[in-house]
């Protein structure tokens, strides 16, 4: 929630939440309503975190085109069936990422995975980047992403 709203937005949401509900017995829906109202955002899909059991799994596929200096990142999400929930709706997964290259270090950005599969294209990437994903543990997920030992050393 913090990553989606930012510190200031999260604070606004908390202030509104306490203004409305201080001393009351409330629900997760009350909390989300305060966050949504304070920030003017639709958090309907975010409710899946509260209503669906299990931990989402995100599969990472990357492709670098040296000729066009373009990097494509495809993320696919799934969540295993649980008793009473065979079918799962896509989660709203906020993922902080950074592309690290020898030439430059791209700015950290927030990608919002809301569909079963989404692709992002990054232009003007001079070298094959090393992907740093789920920075600061931006989402409580499992990640399927095989990285070379060299790439892992770059991340340290």
Each model region followed by its residue ranges:
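Inter-helical turn/loop segments and adjacent helix faces that build the functional surface
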Residues: 5
